[in-house]
């Protein structure tokens, strides 16, 4: 009887530790680090550094950004399983480019839903081959990935995890379709490829509309403690929005 009680107590302790575990787990080219509560940032250093996010919910996990390829998605999943054994429920394609949607095939293979706006899904369907070719031009080692479309498509803004993960569109910027993802309880904003330390690649950007999109974001007056940049160093305060707006206003318009 005592042994059984001890086993139950130990199992409960393991569950409790898993529920409140914080810190960072790492692999060769990737890390998963707690930002606040159930919100974690992924620093993916394969190809060109990109930063994605993971939300550990009560019933399962939401991944924000599919990562570069099925192989990098698999690496992220290994890190996720070191934090929680709960299933990955869904993965958000935050825009139609390879760094945000290249891992779709892996996530679908484990039964996760791949989620996007209709605008992102339509751009993937029409322009995926072009985006892969563009990626391979700069990164010859990048694989020639086939198109894997999202299987859950929203006509506009959407929420997941019972409102604890909010995805919204503010206008064209780095791409025509890019969305922000906001975690209201933690006051964390994921800037996607729209916000980052450096100006970055503007090949598909609407440079003229970009500042207006950032002004619309600021007009929402979201309570924000932390902004996660989509590339470069991930952790910033809300001042990253004004910082990038100044960069884009100074950029040449084609």
From Swiss-Prot:
The keyword Cell membrane does not apply. Keywords: Antibiotic resistance, Hydrolase, Metal-binding, Periplasm, Signal, Zinc. One of its GO terms (cellular component) is periplasmic space. InterPro entries: Beta-lactamase_class-B_CS, Metallo-B-lactamas, NDM-1-like, RibonucZ/Hydroxyglut_hydro. Pfam families: Lactamase_B (PF00753). One of its GO terms (molecular function) is beta-lactamase activity. One of its GO terms (biological process) is response to antibiotic. Zn(2+) binds at residues 99, 193, 231. Induction: By either cefoxitin or imipenem. Competitively inhibited by mercaptophosphonate and pyridine carboxylate derivatives. Also inhibited by the binding of a second zinc ion and by chelating agents such as EDTA. Its main location: periplasm. CDD domains: CphA_ImiS-like_MBL-B2. SMART domains: Lactamase_B (SM00849). It is found in: Periplasm. Belongs to the metallo-beta-lactamase superfamily. Class-B beta-lactamase family. Confers resistance to the different beta-lactams antibiotics (penicillin, cephalosporin and carbapenem) via the hydrolysis of the beta-lactam ring. It is able to hydrolyze penicillin and imipenem, but is much less active against cephalothin, cefotaxime, meropenem and ceftazidime. This is Metallo-beta-lactamase type 2. It comes from Aeromonas hydrophila. The lineage of its organism: Bacteria, Pseudomonadati, Pseudomonadota, Gammaproteobacteria, Aeromonadales.
């Amino acid at each position: 009887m005592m042994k059984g009680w001890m086993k139950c107590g130990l199992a409960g302790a393991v569950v409790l530790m898993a529920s409140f575990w914080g810190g960072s787990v790492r692999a060769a080219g990737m890390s998963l680090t707690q930002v606040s509560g159930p919100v974690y940032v992924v620093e993916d250093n394969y190809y060109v550094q990109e930063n994605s996010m993971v939300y550990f919910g009560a019933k399962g996990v939401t991944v924000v950004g599919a990562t570069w390829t099925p192989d990098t998605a698999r690496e992220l999943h290994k890190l996720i399983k070191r934090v929680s054994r709960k299933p990955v429920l869904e993965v958000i394609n935050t825009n139609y480019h390879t760094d945000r949607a290249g891992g779709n095939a892996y996530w679908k293979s484990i039964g996760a839903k791949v989620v996007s706006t209709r605008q992102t899904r339509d751009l993937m369907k029409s322009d995926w081959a072009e985006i892969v070719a563009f990626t391979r031009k700069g990164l010859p080692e990048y694989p020639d990935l086939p198109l894997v479309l999202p299987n859950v498509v929203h006509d506009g803004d959407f929420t997941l995890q019972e409102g604890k993960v909010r995805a919204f569109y503010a206008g064209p910027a780095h791409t025509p379709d890019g969305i922000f993802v906001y975690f209201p309880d933690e006051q964390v904003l994921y800037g996607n490829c729209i916000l980052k330390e450096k100006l970055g690649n503007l090949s598909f950007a609407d440079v003229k509309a970009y500042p207006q999109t950032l002004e619309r974001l600021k007009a929402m007056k979201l309570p924000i403690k932390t902004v996660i940049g989509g590339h470069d160093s991930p952790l910033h305060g809300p001042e990253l929005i004004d910082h990038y707006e100044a960069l884009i206003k100074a950029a040449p318009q084609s």
